[in-house]
């Protein structure tokens, strides 16, 4: 029985090997789970752990709520949604991968059918009948613990999308539309779902509207359609100037500010004093306006000419007769003024406009508006949306209403409403999902304000205007699409409900829903085949945000601005990691600490600063919230109390970098690495690398192939452990306890008592993944790093996966590198390696190929998998068993048979001789042809696994049965171990209850009244302990309970075994016409060789040019030969100096390890070793290691693990300084300049100058020469041109193109050219002839007509021109 101890400071794996950190700052908050963006999004979509009453209106729940209730056309029946629940998945993740299934759970929705009494006259009609039922709505794919989906047996990732946020956006065309370069402003209302609404200015300053990017209409048509008259429109958009006719003079109500900038057309006097303020012809300035305000002028007498040309704000009507003298927006003319005077109209209302900041845009637009009423406006919009259809009043009204004002068709969403309200200045963040009249007006007003110079346009690339759409949201949208299709079908069937007694199940067909989901996960642009080369590539793939995809950008249309790094990317999106090539800047990676908020905007954490003092309180800020804050960097100097010491602090404010005083600072960055992504945070000395090279380094780490023996980097950044544990490739303890049993394929843990809840088993069994194929054919293999009896805590690493070493990410190998030229073999980034690397299998990788053989039911009969194959010798069948399937462990090469299969041939007419042979020998071989699965060309390896899938109902062959038996044995083994531990636990409690108690009787020599001793219990069989009778009734009852527990345990184990057995032995659901599938897995060992691509972590990539014998490599004075020689010219021009610093620090790390090894070999005391380790780990830096918490054994284990070198961590932007590297080199007794005298291995002479030598972490990338090299003799040809196909996959030839032909022509190599164009390419007759000739040993060729020439002739004839060749 395991009992928990206090939580230790370090994990089990960490204690075995500490990493010395050079970080100057302590991280204030732990790095959030790297896969949280995926896991949280899908968790919110499913809401499986939430009660129905507490479910939020998101995900599945929101999709159902938005479509239901569904009413019939007559309104007499409706379907209501009550709730849903997800069942258990039929197979676990591992089974789904093996069987090629989708890991999903059945979705059952509780639907209520309400039938109303249609004959009743009441309104609302009374309910006649209610029927409730659980309806199956298809399977919903489940997310695995590591954020992936298993679809048809392959792991996929749904990448998050960065798209334009719904809301309103104001922009201008940057002067590109019109030749004058005038800025044309526009506004666009983007809904989450529905039609786009654009408002735009044209070069003549009229305002237009477009719906869904169709033909533009004057904006006043839209306003009229909303019910506004010309007067209303003008009063909304313009200030009014009132003019009164008094005593034959025109007086205007004076607002002095409105005159500013105008040229006075008459003298302006102060009425009381007659003082002249402005002379005629002078421009009115701010000084003049001040004078007017000072003299408190209320009105201004203006000459009649001043009014001519002004625009009316209201209709002018003679009240006595009702006669219209002028319409609103008409210009005032001489005639109009006369008519008004004649009709006794004394007041004129004019709109106020000027050229500076009160443009007459809406007035001008009204002038070109052809419509005069709401109906005409609606008809005009109808004509634009539905050209060619005759409009009716009802159709026009319905169309316009459905565009923006109906929830089913239009939805701004919560985000869109929030963004909209904030942009147009509405105080609340909430509101309706559809548009209102006021919304449209406020957008037009804001647009006109911007045109008038008030306010700014928006920046589309600002992360406040782009939001992340994650898996959950995309799946919900897809689900809603499926439900809407269901709704249409259900509506039609609902009318039958009244006549027939139907249940909800009969009405709903779930096919459209499951088809929509299947389509999304199977073929959406954002549902991608998971990048599984190594753990880092998996993590990065899940943290990717893409601007491409449905509803996003396209590569061709994306300009430079969208791709560029934006100031708001700081701490949210990595400025370094993005692909090279056409997708640059469109696909990004989230920064280490970034997360998305409820609206989908990316947030980054900041420490709160109050009055110049930094607190430990952390707040997440989105790009919108960050704008007005002053945010300091994380490396600001602080005193012990957290006060900022500097007088001026560099900070970010209004998206700019500036210096400011400490009292203004509101926030401070959490960590220096918060601006970069996971991959970039793994590059040591990133701050010394050029950004372009850092980009390549980030991308190439993702292509590193897992080596046979992973080796941790000597120089890391401290992120390695986090990436390895979050990636899900290593096995992490779910609960603490003691290791009970370990072997290569599983770990059994006896869980601590206080970590088990009632009804839970106190045993955790971890089955390890052994030699499993990844999506990229690399090998996924886990190996335990714990031993029996070890005490572990929750979260400890129990087993290393691919590319992990003691729970740390380990993508490559530490190699002794020298920067020097070597006989031209490292020209142009080539790399020279030592034979020792090959010999020690440092970069040997295992690749697993999956080969599949399918037996089908054909027209001529069934294909059969068998070892009885016609015309094949015994030796070719030596690796097959009696079922015709290859043995596990067989070493095979190209052309070997893996699975024997025969296919029936068509019946052919037999010759008399064949008939005789068949009669004598019963020969049936001619009926079938050999269609066995063979090893493809260029491949050889070892068979490591075979899977046989048989169609349900067919008899299984011997091999399939033996595979099943193995599987059952594994299940049985797990159950036996679990049962053993749980039984021991129960018997331990029984013995605890019985010891020293007085017995009244029992088996064996137990006399009544005697005490029960341990000796007695040891002699009696454990099963009979329950027969001992005891005086104490309470204890007797407890014993009885424990006895029942044992019985229940036995039953539970039997049930679990039977369930597993049923699953294992059931037939497989194969595609139609498929009888049997055999999958063979080959492990291919690839050693490193010339042509393979290698790289460091700083973008320093190259191809191996030669493998040099160890004795020829340059070596140091102590005889140590270097492993790899790089060209020093690869450093200065590339500006990635990080690799040089890494080399120096790597040398120090290795030297320190050597000194520790020396101390261990000299058998020095633990105290002496501890003192030396203290010097290494704790003589500087903030992030110290507490060695006091280790006992002597742990200390010696640690020291032993440090023999190969002391791992160092130099966090990005907070790494080791030059001085610190030098002090480490001195501590290891190495030269402080990191240079060493090298001796040429071939001559034995010293090189002229000392050379930079040290340890660099090198990766082998997934660009292997074995996969790329290819040669062809004869093969398949293109159908039309008869030329050989191209590419390795088609077993194609090399293209001899136009330029190559010129080269041969230039050399006059006529015969070579002739054979290139004829017998080696598309001269069909000639190539068969030469093949025969070569076989016969005759090397002559007889060229004929190339087939492509015949194609050309046929094309010319198709044009009606007849060409015939004349033969001499």
Curated annotation (Swiss-Prot):
InterPro entries: DNA-dir_RNA_pol_bsu_ext_1_sf (IPR042107), DNA-dir_RNA_pol_bsu_external_1 (IPR019462), DNA-dir_RNA_pol_su2 (IPR015712), DNA-dir_RNAP_su2_dom (IPR007120), DNA-dir_RNAP_su2_hyb_sf (IPR037033), RNA_pol_bsu_bac (IPR010243), RNA_pol_bsu_CS (IPR007121), RNA_pol_bsu_protrusion (IPR007644). The keyword Oxidoreductase does not apply. GO terms for cellular component: DNA-directed RNA polymerase complex. One of its GO terms (biological process) is DNA-templated transcription. Its EC number is 2.7.7.6. SUPFAM superfamilies: beta and beta-prime subunits of DNA dependent RNA-polymerase. CDD domains: RNA_pol_B_RPB2. It comes from the Bacteria. It catalyses: RNA(n) + a ribonucleoside 5'-triphosphate = RNA(n+1) + diphosphate. DNA-dependent RNA polymerase catalyzes the transcription of DNA into RNA using the four ribonucleoside triphosphates as substrates. The RNAP catalytic core consists of 2 alpha, 1 beta, 1 beta' and 1 omega subunit. When a sigma factor is associated with the core the holoenzyme is formed, which can initiate transcription. HAMAP family: RNApol_bact_RpoB (MF_01321). This is DNA-directed RNA polymerase subunit beta.
